[in-house]
């Protein structure tokens, strides 16, 4: 029987993207235009990278659905999406809110009522999708500024997969969610001074 040669690929190999979600559940009725988010990020010393196809009209629109925002060349961008109650993704909105509400109400913790009230009053939520195999500390900080923008400007409450929900005033974890896998989750970056 002939031997079958084993061929190995040298050099760096791309890992399969591993999606990681962070969200802000917002009570405000309308989402701010993306242009305000971009200005907020610039004010923090970041240089948001946006596709040249994104024009002023889109950046000034209140009715946006999603946008990829890069934080560093050579790194995958963060996908910032908006899911609205009663919008085109209403079914997704209802499923996500209902699923989280069921979990929160089934697990009695000291502050679960605060999370349940936030979810019941939620008009839209922002879901940031990150690739855990490609993000750096700089990317986590950049993502935390995006979360902070919506938390501050839209009466939001931050939720991070595998961690939980955070108090909007203190930044403290107030309701813990189970880990999403065996890997340790990154700590929530500390609140940046405004």
Report each predicted region and the residues it spans.
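Acidic (Asp/Glu-rich) sequence patches and key acidic residues
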Residues: 1-194
């Amino acid at each position: 029987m002939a031997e079958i040669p084993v061929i190995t690929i040298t050099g760096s190999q791309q890992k399969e993207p591993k999606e990681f979600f962070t969200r802000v559940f917002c009570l405000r009725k309308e989402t701010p235009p993306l242009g305000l988010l971009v200005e907020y990020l610039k004010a923090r010393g970041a240089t948001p990278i946006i596709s040249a196809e994104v024009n002023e009209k889109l950046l000034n629109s209140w009715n946006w659905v999603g946008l990829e925002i890069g934080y560093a060349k050579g790194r995958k961008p963060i996908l910032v999406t908006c899911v609205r109650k009663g919008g085109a993704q209403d079914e997704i909105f209802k499923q996500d809110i209902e699923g989280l509400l069921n979990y929160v109400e089934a697990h009695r913790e000291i502050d679960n009522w605060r999370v349940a009230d936030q979810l019941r009053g939620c008009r839209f939520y922002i879901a940031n999708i990150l690739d855990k195999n490609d993000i750096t500390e700089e990317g986590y900080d950049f993502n935390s500024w995006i979360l902070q923008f919506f938390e501050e400007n839209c009466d939001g409450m931050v939720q991070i997969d595998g961690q939980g929900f955070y108090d909007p005033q203190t930044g403290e974890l107030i309701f813990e969610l189970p880990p999403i896998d065996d890997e340790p989750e990154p700590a929530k970056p500390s609140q940046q001074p405004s």
